[in-house]
Regions:
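ATP-binding Walker
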Residues: 29
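ATP-dependent small-molecule kinase phosphotransfer cores
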Residues: 50-121
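Extreme N-terminal, non-catalytic leader segments
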Residues: 1-19
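Walker A/P-loop
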Residues: 32
């Protein structure tokens, strides 16, 4: 289990710690299930995947991508995610180039959104590549959503209409669910029913909320 990272700048609201929580997990493990449940409960969810899509419309990002990959990634005067994806998927060098351009934009946007929501006690960051992108220092606690390998494979094949070989290739191209679980403060096993997943989320929320209240009490005392 990991502890609070030394690069984090802690903020306080009326003397209370504001906690940014990362939600991560490997492909087809069910991060969206967790995020949607938290969103329905009224918590703010910063969606890194959406920020990644927005990055492709940013003029500075687009200019750098065109310079690196050429006009072959352009379709209808926009960057084609499909064409860009074909260039980077399975190509480590191209993927590094893409990440070096897009990740700084995403990091900047996350920090801005965390600042906007700095009046809230708990803010959640939904990000698949939390560890791979080196964004751990943007959060104080990490929730890893985990599923059993066989279930992960079956879900990915069904969701993306992939063959077993294609799905395995995508799973193996990322950090494994087991490895990510070792780095989390909390692990949600999403292998069973949604109700069971929700129960685990509620337990974590209770601990997080109680922790914030406890910090407040310590400060006031």
């Amino acid at each position: 289990m990991i502890t609070v990272y030394d690069k984090i700048v802690h903020k306080k609201l009326n003397g209370v710690d504001i906690v940014n929580i990362g939600i991560t997990g490997s492909i087809a493990c069910g991060k969206s299930t967790v995020s949607n449940y938290l969103r329905d409960k009224g918590y703010t969810i910063i969606d890194a995947d959406k920020l990644g899509h927005t990055a492709l419309t940013d003029n500075e990002v687009r200019e750098k991508l065109e310079k690196s990959f050429g006009l072959r990634i352009i379709e209808n005067n926009e960057i084609s995610r499909e064409k860009l994806g074909k260039l980077v998927f399975g190509n480590e060098e191209n993927l590094k180039i893409l990440n070096s351009i897009v990740h700084p934009y995403i990091r900047k946007q996350i920090l801005q959104l965390q600042e906007i929501h700095s009046d809230e006690r708990l803010v959640f960051l939904d990000i698949a590549l939390l560890f791979e992108a080196g964004f751990e220092n943007l959060v104080e606690k990490i929730i890893v959503v985990h599923v059993d390998e066989k279930i992960q494979l079956a879900r990915l094949m069904s969701r993306n209409s992939l063959s077993k070989e294609q799905a395995m290739f995508r799973i193996e191209s990322q950090m494994s669910s087991n490895d990510k679980s070792k780095l989390g403060n909390y692990v949600i096993n999403n292998s069973n029913t949604k109700e069971e997943t929700y129960r685990q989320i509620d337990l974590i929320l209770d601990e997080l909320e109680r922790g914030v209240i406890k910090n407040d009490e310590c400060i006031r005392n």
